[in-house]
Regions:
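An alpha-helical, amphipathic repeat domain used for nucleic-acid recognition
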Residues: 1-156
């Protein structure tokens, strides 16, 4: 029911083709869109159609999602994995896409975030300052052991 009326199968397909063409989508996104369109019949059939016609490709989606969240939002591996799992993405695709993040770039991003956060924190006590930086990076989804290793290295 869209604006008080029901939509048919063909209309749902057309809307979802357009929806998937605008931006990379996963099954979870399409199911949510179907619910917003109030279209509850033949959902599996629609999703199978979109997959077979390459409108939905979970591997491609995972790779682009991972790359975007790391490059643009500066998320760490943990947060990216968590959000992909929330979308119901297969663990194989998650691991594959996370491994494609270059280790050097990952460390450089963490160091940049540490540097920016260090400048922003007014705290004089180095222990409290380091704890605040660590909390910030943990919220971004970076690994705790790597965080402390880099904080200790940068504070020397």
């Amino acid at each position: 029911m869209q604006n008080g009326r029901f939509i048919n199968y063909e209309t749902a397909i057309k809307k979802l083709e357009k929806y998937c063409s605008i931006q990379e989508r996963c099954r979870h996104d399409v199911i949510i869109k179907l619910k917003k369109l109030n279209f509850f019949k033949k959902n599996d059939q629609i999703i199978n159609y979109l997959v077979s016609n390459n409108f939905i490709n979970e591997e491609r989606f995972t790779l682009l999602y991972c790359n975007g969240k790391f490059s643009i939002k500066k998320w760490g591996r943990i947060k990216i994995s968590y959000h992909l799992k929330q979308k119901g993405i297969d663990n194989i695709y998650i691991l594959k896409s996370i491994k494609k993040i270059p280790e050097k770039k990952y460390i450089e991003t963490m160091i940049d975030l540490i540097t920016k956060k260090t400048k922003a924190i007014k705290e004089q006590d180095s222990y409290k300052k380091n704890c605040a930086i660590a909390r910030y990076l943990m919220q971004k989804g970076f690994e705790t052991d790597l965080i402390w290793k880099l904080i200790n290295k940068n504070s020397k």
